[in-house]
Amino acid sequence: MTAASEHLVLVLNSGSSSIKYQLVDPETGEVSAAGLVERIGEDDSAIEHRCGARTIGHEGRIPDHRAGLERVFEMFAETGFDLAGAGLRAVGHRVVHGGEMFHEPTLVTDEVVAAIADFAELAPLHNPANVTGIENARRLLPGVPQVAVFDTAFFHGLPDAAKTYAIDAKIAAEYGIRRYGFHGISHEYVSGRVAEVLDLDPARLRQIVFHLGNGASASAVRGGSPIDTSMGLTPLEGLVMGTRGGDLDPGILGHLARAAGFDVDRIDKLLNREAGLKGMAGVNDFRELRRLIDEGDAAAKLAYDVYVHRLRRYLGAYLIALGGVDAITFTAGVGENSADVRADALAGLENFGIAVDPARNTAKDRGARVISPPAAPVTVLVVPTNEELAIARAADRLVAAG
């Protein structure tokens, strides 16, 4: 470990079936080590751990997040990083749901962990994994400050009309029912990067941001602040996702309960794990979906069409909500890598000043870039998200503030 290790932040992003991690210098953005634990709970689980020029891997079943994180710490040791003795600045944790309680980075205590666990009902795929990551990091790195950075925080100040559901007001107040929004760390980072890339004052920008990964969300941002977002009380609402279907008629749930005998747990499993692309096409990996489409699979093609249709519906809604748009940005795994999704989502919108340049859209450039024609009234961009850097900086600021 270098002498500058006291400036480094270990960032943990424990997802529903994965753990992403980076060892980051929050000042320079330099990444000393990084890796990904994939397909947790499946027979073909894998870890890729990168440290400088060296990469090591693990293949074989990883039963749960705890086992995955323990193996990650072993791989750090194998590549010469004694995290326990490194004098890290902090560990920063991405936490999906902060409810009404948390709307800024927070130093982790037992009470904070308990509160995050209580919100698991609202984010059942994510908060339990977040809690596991925090608990294991506290156990493996005692004495290192642990900071929770919440995905809901960016949307805490949504306008009342955007965050309020049209249900009984007393029930909503009693049970904390409102639109919270998610992927806020990414939406805040990317919308800020757009202003930097375009060299424009963010206060003057009207933006629509599509965060398209296994989870997917959209936001409308005016002057650096969100005015609407697609996810709601939970990460189930909005766009079509890998295993979540997004918007649906709530009457479907009552119908399934009466006609098929589905109880709450069965409905929860259906909506969180068996819907979306997986429910329609049998796969939740967009690369696999594309392969099936190329092979002529009709279900996969329909799933893709539903996915794009939902994107266009939110695009239209946010275009009106903003009163026009200056920049439309795609980010996250699908958003950054699928030229087809970007082109199809924005096809035929030239009358609105929205167009994609085919050559720019299919270029192999991995950085932030403009993909609209030079003279287009609306700038379309691809901007890689960097939630890890955003979390590292947030954790560093909190620790520095004492």
UniProtKB/Swiss-Prot annotation:
Cofactor entry: Mg(2+); Mn(2+)
Keyword Magnesium annotated: yes
Binding residues for ATP: 20, 211-215, 285-287, 333-337
Main location per the UniProt record: cytoplasm
Substrates-to-products reaction catalysed: acetate + ATP = acetyl phosphate + ADP
Keywords, in A-Z order: ATP-binding, Cytoplasm, Kinase, Magnesium, Metal-binding, Nucleotide-binding, Transferase
Lineage top rank: taxon: Bacteria
Binding site for Mg(2+): 13, 387
Residues flagged as site, Transition state stabilizer: 183, 244
Subcellular location: Cytoplasm
Pfam families linked: Acetate_kinase
Gene Ontology MF terms: acetate kinase activity; ATP binding; magnesium ion binding
Subunit-level organization: Homodimer.
Primary role: Catalyzes the formation of acetyl phosphate from acetate and ATP. Can also catalyze the reverse reaction.
Protein name per Swiss-Prot or TrEMBL: Acetate kinase
Organism of provenance: Nocardia farcinica (strain IFM 10152)
Gene: ackA
